[in-house]
C-alpha cells in the first residue's frame, strides 16, 4: 500500500492535478493577463475569507517574502486589500475586493464548466467511484 501511495503521489497525482486544474489555470491566466500564482491566491481567498499572511503562506505553500510580493501585486491591481485585525493591530488579514471576487468567481465558473465536460465522459459507476476516492483522500489528509 505504501509503495502504491508513493507512486500515486509522485506520478499519478501530478497528472490528475495538471489535467483537471493547472492546464485550465494556465489558459485562463494567459487570457486574463494575471499570473497563475495570483489566480491561485484569488481562488483560495474566495473560499477562505479572513486569513492572515502566515496561514496563507502555509496554505499556498510559498515563502513569506514571495507571498508579500504576490499580495503587493494583487493589491496594486485592485484585487485584494489588507485589513488590520481587531485582536492584533500588527497583524493583517487579506481580503478580496469586489474586482478580485469577480475574477475568482469567473474562473471557478469556467473551471466548473470545463470539469463537467470531462466528468460527463465517465460512466455513472466511475463518477461515483471518483467521489468515493475524493472522500477517502480527504479523510486521509485529516489523519
Give the label of every model feature segment:
Residues 1-32:
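N-terminal leader segment of winged-helix/HTH proteins
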Residues 1-4, 23, 125-143:
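C-terminal regulatory/oligomerization modules of transcriptional regulators
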Residues 13, 38, 60, 64, ...:
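Short amphipathic alpha-helical/adjacent loop interface patches that line ligand
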Residues 16, 20-24, 78, 107, ...:
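Hydrophobic recognition helices of helix-based DNA-binding modules
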Residues 22-63:
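N-terminal helix-turn-helix DNA-binding core of bacterial DNA-binding proteins
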Residues 53-54, 65, 72, 92:
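Residues within helix-turn-helix
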Residues 73-128:
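Charged, amphipathic alpha-helical coiled-coil/dimerization segments
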Amino acid at each position: 500500500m505504501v509503495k502504491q501511495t508513493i507512486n500515486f503521489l509522485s506520478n499519478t497525482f501530478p497528472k490528475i492535478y495538471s489535467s483537471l486544474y493547472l492546464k485550465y489555470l494556465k489558459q485562463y491566466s494567459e487570457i486574463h493577463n494575471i499570473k497563475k500564482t495570483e489566480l491561485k491566491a484569488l481562488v483560495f481567498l474566495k473560499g477562505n475569507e479572513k486569513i492572515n499572511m502566515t496561514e496563507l503562506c502555509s496554505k499556498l505553500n510559498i515563502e513569506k517574502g514571495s507571498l508579500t510580493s504576490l499580495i503587493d501585486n494583487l493589491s496594486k491591481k485592485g484585487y485584494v486589500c489588507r485589513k488590520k485585525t481587531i485582536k492584533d493591530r500588527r497583524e493583517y488579514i487579506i481580503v478580496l475586493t469586489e474586482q478580485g471576487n469577480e475574477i475568482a468567481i469567473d474562473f471557478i465558473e469556467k473551471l466548473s464548466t470545463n470539469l463537467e465536460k470531462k466528468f460527463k465522459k465517465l460512466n455513472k459507476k466511475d463518477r461515483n467511484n471518483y467521489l468515493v476516492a475524493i472522500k477517502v483522500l480527504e479523510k486521509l489528509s485529516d489523519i
